Amino acid sequence: MWRTVILALALLAMLTIGCVNPRSSAGFRLPDGDAERGKAAFLELKCYNCHTVSGVDLAVRGKEYAYLRSVVLGGETRRVRTYGELVTSIINPSHSLAPGYPKELITKDGKSAMADFNDTLTVHQLIDLVTFLQSHYQLVPPEIPGS
C-alpha cells in the first residue's frame, strides 16, 4: 500500500515540475532514462509475453502466454508518440486503445488485458522503459496524394 502511495506521489511531483518534451508540442518529460536499462526492465517485467519491439531481438526463450498476436511497439508511425503517451500507455493501458488493437487482448468490459504494473514498477524502471521504447519509433511523413 505504501509503495503505491509513494509511487503515486513521486509521479505527481514529477508531473507538476516536468517540462514539455522539446521534440513534441504536448506532454511532459521525466528525467532522462537509460535505454539499455529500459530493455532490461522490459525483459524483467516480462513485457515480451504480449509485446514485441520493432527491430529489437529480445532473445527470449518462450512466452508464458499464448496470445495469437503480439502488440508491436516502435517502428514507423505517421504521428509522434509523445513521452506522455508512452507513460500513460504503461501506467493506464486502458486509457486509449489503439486502432487495430487485437480483439483477443480486450476484456469483456472493453479494457486492455495488460496487467497492472503500478504496484511493482519503479519510477526508474518507468523512465528507462519509456526511453527504450521511444528510441524505437521512427516518424514517417504522411503521404500526400498527387505529389
Question: How would you label these PLM feature ranges?
Answer:
Residues M1-I6:
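Bacterial N-terminal signal peptides that target proteins for export
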Residues A13, A41-E44, K108:
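Processing junctions and N-termini across compartments
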Residues L15-G18:
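C-terminal motif of bacterial Sec signal peptides marking the signal peptidase cleavage site
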Residues V20-L43, G75-R79, S147:
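Electrostatic cytochrome c docking/interface patches
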Residues A35, K39, T52-H95, Y101-K103, ...:
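Gly/Gly-Pro-rich "capping" loops immediately C-terminal to redox-active cysteine motifs
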Residues L43-N49, S54, Q125:
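Short pre-active-site segment immediately N-terminal to redox-active cysteine/selenocysteine motifs
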Residues C47, S94-A98, Q138:
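Generic structural signal for secondary-structure transition and capping sites
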Residues T88, D109-S147:
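C-terminal capping alpha-helices of c-type cytochrome domains
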